[in-house]
Amino acid sequence: MNKLYLAWWNLENLFDIEKSQYRDTWLQEKLKDELKGWNAEVLKRKIGQLSKIIKQMNNEQGPDLLGVCEVESRHVLKQLAASLGNQYDIIHADTNDKRGIDVAFIYNSHKITPILEETQRGPQPKVYSHVVMKRNATRDILQAELIWEGHPFIVIANHWPSRSGGELKSEPYRMMAGETLAYWMDRIQDIRPDVPAIVMGDFNDEPSNRSLTEYALSTREHSKAASKRARNPYLYNLTTPLLGAEIGTHKYQGEWGFLDQMLANRAALNNNNIHYNKGSISIVANNELIKAKNRPLNQGQPRRFNRPSSKYYDPEGYSDHLPVSIELNLPK
């Protein structure tokens, strides 16, 4: 097959059980009220709900690579991967986020292979966990390289600081994350300019916000990102064709937005490399994922799973975000 299906999904607080042996003491104390009632049965239910949707992706073949955020640990991530089938494996690095949630990848090992390095656990995917300098620790930016049919490509997962405390007050933190991303994209451009890179994440900002356009150098102009004459390594925002659609990836105060996005570097827009299949960007949205109460889907909102300690706990739910997906093609 000359097609690769990539997706991104904010899993909404996929934590390990309430009193997990894998959780640090400081985090256990911090989360004890939030995770009250989050037992093995609830975790199994949450994983089952997520797994059901993930398996439906890519015409029920499942994604070839899925970027995720709001997953607590390697331990719980491996449980999710196992629920998808034995062909799936994970790419993960612990971060110092103040709520203990990370970004990661799940990939189909029958189709793509990560670059490996030797570790205490034996050969593991080689990752670069780029720290975002912030007073209160946030998620690192996770970078990995994979091989598909002999061709390398890079994937980078983001979960930028939230809008907690207000959009404007928190904006500098996301600008900092954008600057960090741009720095590493600049290094990739300098050292490996012909390697395609797909950047994905929950940026907690819209495509038009400064953190993306001015700091991460994301653009909605395909020609600007594809140009070899551009002085800076611009990223084409693949979400561009979806802007203005009736449904986004997240709903806040009755308005759909596009906090979850995918971006591509210049090499990923070149048909001589692994490249983005133009027009393939899509939001994964259906009657299961959106709670619309017999109204049109755009009038509903993502059906949250939440947690037992919340009055909004819904064991039939999934996440407060919708997944977004793209396709990549082999060189022509």
Model-flagged regions — what are they?
Residues 1-2, 59-60, 84-85, 97-99, ...:
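Extracellular/periplasmic catalytic domains that process cell-envelope and extracellular macromolecules
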Residues 20-22, 28, 149-156, 160-179, ...:
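Metal-dependent phosphoester/phosphodiester hydrolase catalytic core
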